[in-house]
Curated annotation (Swiss-Prot):
The keyword Secreted applies. Its main location: secreted. This is Vicilin-like antimicrobial peptides 2-3. Belongs to the 7S seed storage protein family. SUPFAM superfamilies: RmlC-like cupins (SSF51182). Residues 198-212 have a biased composition (Basic and acidic residues). PANTHER family: CUPINCIN, OS03G0336100 PROTEIN-RELATED.
Length: 625
């Protein structure tokens, strides 16, 4: 019917209406659970035959089905969902010229990406269940099939449990030392040695670790070709042990060079940390607009309800930003509100009736249709260099236009690297901004921390006196160990029967995790922890800490800032049931402070030799994830 029209303009409009009708009629959600693209294609063609009575309309409908299914087959040739998504987006740009068709094509890409992520997660969960079943089968095989040395170690532990609580610690240490001598040490500082309990085969069961969040814990909130926004799993939803974080969420944003992030406001207070790149932030406070250039290490707060937008003003480098949110409407839940958009995001203005909008904006329906819902490219879009220059220039005519650096009295950004390192030596550097340093952090009572640990070195052990921290790996790999008194109850009681509170046994579970880029761990207040740079490069960490005011890091080793060294010798002698000389030799042998040579370095060189230590690469050289 379209081909019989006289003018090309009428023909294009007719074809566009056919396409629109076709896409709107097909309920793609019915096919989302299909594994085989050919099955999807056949169902699509069957739908065409059922709904279209005209043979030519059936032919057109089936041709569109075939095109879509061919795209699906090409899509499935790639194993990685991210690569599939990127190829799909490129195909949309190459084949589609009409904005409507482009949007439909991109929506198909989004559906396929989410479907593949669900399949990937399902495969992971099935593998986890299979591993757990195999582990349980091994445990049911009985003592006779277990390693004699492991059986001896477990017998030793059971013997310790029958002793008085004050003697159990030393007894358990003797068991561990005995097992180490047999080459199956429970020393978690050396993953290759193996371990006991649920870590018995040398690799920790990180799925049992409520404090560890791998990259699968990140869900994609928005994604376009120009970047993506991901949010970490709800802390309190993971475990009740993380109840202190039930009102907080962690968000990671990545934007390509010359990208523009649409204006929005949140029903949550937000603290932004620039991990890499150079950006610009615009915030609207009532009728005033404030603008700030952002650099690596900048920290700034965006109050709830403040409309803001971001620009990557660099031509070559991606912009990486971490956002720490404190929710205010629903604990642990937050929402974005976009005034402009299309279908994803949908503009909140479009939810009002046209009569209301016409009256509020003093305009006509035609103007509303010409503006609202026209932006089809998503939350993060590409801007021309001319548009970037216009958005980031210092416009003297703009109201309340501020280009300034932050400080104690400023609402502008505070740069972590403008102050001296909190701790620094050849093995690492650490920077931190606390509420007492930057007034914008006081209401939320949050601190922001960045550390650079050289390859093979370690930080700690130490504990935070008041603050619980969410620590994320920006680059490198980390072996993390933490002492936790809360997890020991998971493995059952030891003495049987109900005890009085004063007779309760004190036991700490050794919690460990291996973290890679974009993975996180929660360190609760008071929990001793250590971070080891275990990869082939320096380890770069950033962290957000709650309950930050008057928090201090108490270190348990080192020449300086070591709280154990401040305990009187007589008290140490009594506490450790060892001679004063032995205690002093143990706690006074380390010449460094805060950052130390790691376990492997310590084994390769004498404790006092540092000539072979690699030079420290400054954290200022770090440019992103």
């Amino acid at each position: 019917q379209c081909m019989q029209l006289e003018t090309s303009g009428q023909m294009r409009r007719c074809v566009s209406q056919c396409d629109k009708r076709f896409e709107e009629d097909i309920d793609w959600s019915k096919y989302d659970n299909q594994e085989d693209p050919q099955t999807e294609c056949q169902q699509c063609q069957r739908r065409c035959r059922q709904q279209e009575s005209d043979p030519r309309q059936q032919q057109y409908c089936q041709r569109r089905c075939k095109e879509i299914c061919e795209e699906e087959e090409e899509y499935n040739r790639q194993r990685d969902p991210q690569q599939q998504y990127e190829q799909c987006q490129k195909r949309c740009q190459r084949r589609e010229t009409e904005p409507r068709h482009m949007q439909i094509c991109q929506q198909r890409c989004e559906r396929r990406y989410e479907k593949e992520k669900r399949k990937q997660q399902k495969r992971y969960e099935e593998q986890q269940r299979e591993d757990e079943e195999k582990y349980e089968e091994r445990m049911k095989e009985g003592d006779n099939k277990r390693d004699p040395q492991q059986r001896e170690y477990e017998d030793c532990r059971r013997h310790c449990e029958q002793q008085e609580p004050r003697l159990q610690y030393q007894c358990q240490r003797r068991c561990q030392e005995q097992q180490r001598q047999h080459g199956r040490g429970g020393d978690l500082m050396n993953p290759q040695r193996g371990g006991s309990g649920r870590y018995e085969e040398g690799e920790e069961k990180q799925s049992d670790n409520p404090y560890y969040f791998d990259e699968r814990s990140l869900s994609t909130r928005f994604r376009t070709e120009e970047g993506h926004i991901s949010v970490l799993e709800n802390f309190y939803g993971r475990s009740k042990l993380l109840r202190a974080l039930k009102n907080y969420r962690l968000v990671l944003l990545e934007a390509n060079p010359n990208a523009f992030v649409l204006p929005t406001h949140l029903d949550a207070d937000a603290i932004l940390l620039v991990i890499g790149g150079r950006g610009a932030l615009k915030m609207i406070h009532r009728d005033n607009r404030e603008s700030y250039n952002l650099e690596c290490g900048d920290v700034i707060r965006i109050p709830a309800g403040t409309t803001f937008y971001l620009i990557n003003r660099d031509n070559n480098e991606r912009l990486h930003i971490a956002k720490f949110l404190q929710t205010i409407s629903t604990p642990g839940q937050y929402k974005e509100f976009f005034p402009a958009g299309g279908q994803n995001p949908e503009p909140y203005l479009s939810t009002f009736s046209k009569e209301i909008l016409e009256a509020a904006l003093n305009t006509q329906t035609e103007r509303l249709r010409g503006v609202l819902g026209q932006q089809r490219e998503g939350v993060i879009i590409r801007a021309s260099q001319e548009q970037i220059r216009e958005l980031t220039r210092d416009d003297s005519e703009s109201r309340r236009w501020h280009i300034r650096r932050g400080g104690e009295s400023s609402r502008g950004p505070y740069n972590l690297f403008n102050k001296r390192p909190l701790y620094s030596n050849k093995y690492g550097q650490a920077y931190e901004v606390k509420p007492e340093d930057y007034r914008q952090l006081q209401d939320m009572d949050v601190s922001v921390f960045i550390a650079n640990i050289t390859q093979g070195s370690m930080m700690g052990p130490f504990f935070n006196t008041r603050s619980t921290k969410v620590v994320v790996v920006a680059s490198g790999e980390a072996d993390v160990e933490m002492a936790c008194p809360h997890l020991s109850g998971r493995h059952g009681g030891r003495g049987g029967g109900k005890r009085h509170e004063e007779e309760e046994e004190v036991h700490y579970e050794q919690v460990r995790a291996r973290l890679s880029k974009r993975e996180a761990i929660v360190v609760l207040a008071g929990h001793p922890v250590v971070f080891v740079s275990s990869g082939n490069e320096n380890l770069l960490l950033f962290a957000f800490g709650i309950n930050a005011q008057n928090n201090h890091e108490n270190f348990l080793a080192g020449r300086e800032r070591n709280v154990l060294q401040q305990i009187e010798p007589q008290a140490m002698e009594l506490a450790f049931a060892a001679s004063r000389k032995e205690v002093e030799e143990l706690f006074n042998s380390q010449d460094e402070s805060i950052f130390f040579p790691g376990p492997r370095q310590h084994q390769q060189q004498s404790p006092r030799s540092t000539k072979q230590q690699q030079p420290l690469v400054s954290i200022l050289d770090f440019v992103g994830f």
